[in-house]
């Protein structure tokens, strides 16, 4: 009997083991040794959202049904909460240990426009709860083939110069208020009828939440699902270890304010593969904030491979926060089409740090609006409504955190169409951009091949070919 049970147990584990083994194929022929991810495993328990009172009619609020389903699984040690076919209106969802949120193919989770549902009671924070969160959890996942929609147009400001007349009219028909001589629209006093949660549109805008934010978690999986229309960032693991992003789609309007797609903030051991991004801000982004006690710091051991990025401010982005360091990042075999920039390294005084062992190879790009490759050391965050011409000032403490882009190796890049091929500018008197090599790269149909400030940067170009449509200036 014991032998039979062992055989059955092994058979039940086989698919997970096989899937885990599949991830090893991505780690072949790496230019640097890095820790590999392992797929989280979950108990075989399953709860269907309908069985705990859920109604997928697009009208009924299912916040309590999600809570009941997760609580029921938690008491059993974890398992899968299945969201079946339907449109499931809900407030915030909080995942627990060993919980897999699974969306069937025709399932849409649609987050309520009622902002009151997201306010953290008794909190003095200027932020609200993410649409989906997990905090200090082990083994959490969002999987399946459905859609998760953050209803972001109820939260995001809109700049007039980023929309057509028809789109601007549509926003005004939702309600809202125009500011700054009609150049900015805020979702304030909306016709949806739900009350605002702050006493001014500017204050409320600062409370925008992420669609998915996992903090201080271990063993995280995002697989198959479409994440769209976030109030702010879409998929945002922070201070997490062992994070897998496999085969997801992230999409939002091209003009979505702060509409980052996939942001790894201070994460260790991660994999982003087979995913597609079409976003309003950064595409595949690595961030590293200032060190915190009792928390993961820096971003390291991240493999990014076989992904496609359409619109984004940058397809692969490092920064702007790099303070705790960025180590052992490999980006390869990715496609960028129609992004503002291709490979974007951005940081600034007060948020900068050191990069180590970054390898980027076999990247193809087309129709890049600005730079194919850019190093920027004077980045300043400018929220909607701020003065774009304001000159920043820095304290001595902030000056300690200067960008240090180094030990970066880029090869086998082909780009057709960019305003500038390679742009790099450091900060005079600081060694911000150095020991970087770009090899075996072809950039054609540019207005300018390169714009490199030799006084502040040290780049080595080898076998790099440019071709311009217009005479270089």
Which stretches of residues belong to each language-model region?
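Conserved short loop/turn motifs at secondary-structure junctions
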Residues: 83-91, 261-263, 292, 348-349, ...
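Active-site-proximal loop/turn and secondary-structure-junction residues that shape catalytic pockets
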Residues: 87, 239, 249, 288-290, ...
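Short, small-residue-enriched loops and turns at beta-alpha junctions
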Residues: 55-57, 290-295, 324-325, 351
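Right-handed parallel beta-helix
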Residues: 105-106, 138-146, 218-228, 241-253, ...
């Amino acid at each position: 009997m014991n032998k039979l049970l062992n055989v059955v147990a092994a058979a039940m584990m086989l698919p997970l083991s096989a899937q885990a083994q599949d991830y090893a194929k991505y780690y072949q022929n790496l230019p640097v040794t890095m820790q590999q991810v392992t797929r989280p495993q979950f108990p075989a328990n399953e709860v269907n959202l309908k069985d705990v009172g859920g109604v997928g009619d697009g009208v009924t609020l299912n916040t309590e049904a999600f809570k009941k389903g997760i609580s029921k699984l938690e008491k059993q040690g974890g398992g899968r909460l299945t969201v079946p076919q339907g449109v499931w209106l809900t407030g915030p969802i909080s995942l627990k240990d060993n919980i897999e949120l699974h969306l069937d193919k025709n399932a849409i989770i649609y987050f309520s426009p009622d902002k009151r549902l997201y306010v953290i009671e008794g909190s003095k924070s200027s932020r609200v709860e993410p649409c989906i969160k997990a905090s200090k959890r082990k083994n959490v996942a969002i999987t399946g083939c459905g859609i998760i929609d953050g209803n972001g147009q109820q939260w995001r400001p809109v700049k007039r110069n980023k929309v057509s007349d028809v789109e601007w009219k549509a926003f005004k028909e939702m309600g809202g208020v125009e500011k700054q001589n009609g150049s900015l629209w805020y979702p304030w006093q909306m016709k949806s009828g739900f009350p605002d949660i702050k006493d001014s549109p500017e204050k409320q805008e600062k409370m925008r939440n992420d669609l998915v934010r996992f903090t201080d978690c271990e063993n995280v999986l995002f697989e198959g699902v479409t994440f769209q229309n976030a109030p702010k960032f879409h998929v945002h693991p922070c201070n997490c270890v062992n994070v897998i992003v496999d085969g997801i789609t992230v999409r939002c309007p091209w003009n979505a304010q702060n509409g980052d797609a996939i942001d790894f903030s201070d994460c260790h051991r991660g994999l982003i593969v087979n995913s597609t991004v079409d976003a309003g801000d950064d595409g595949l982004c690595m961030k590293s904030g200032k060190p915190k006690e009792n928390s993961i710091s820096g971003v390291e051991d991240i493999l990014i491979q076989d992904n496609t990025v359409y619109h984004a401010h940058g397809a692969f982005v490092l920064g702007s926060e790099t303070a705790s360091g960025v180590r052992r990042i490999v980006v390869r075999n990715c496609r960028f089409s129609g992004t503002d920039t291709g490979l974007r390294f951005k940081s600034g005084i007060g948020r900068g740090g050191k990069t180590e062992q970054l390898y980027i190879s076999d990247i193809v790009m087309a129709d890049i609006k600005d730079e194919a490759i850019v190093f920027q050391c004077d980045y300043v965050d400018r929220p909607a409504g701020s003065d774009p011409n304001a000159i920043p000032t820095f304290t001595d403490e902030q000056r300690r955190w200067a960008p240090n882009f180094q030990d970066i190796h880029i090869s086998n890049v082909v780009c057709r169409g960019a305003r500038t091929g390679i742009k790099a500018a450091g900060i005079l008197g600081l060694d911000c951009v150095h020991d970087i090599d770009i090899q075996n790269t072809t950039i054609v149909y540019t207005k300018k091949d390169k714009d490199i400030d030799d006084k502040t940067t040290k780049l080595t170009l080898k076998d790099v070919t440019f071709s311009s449509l217009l005479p270089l200036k």
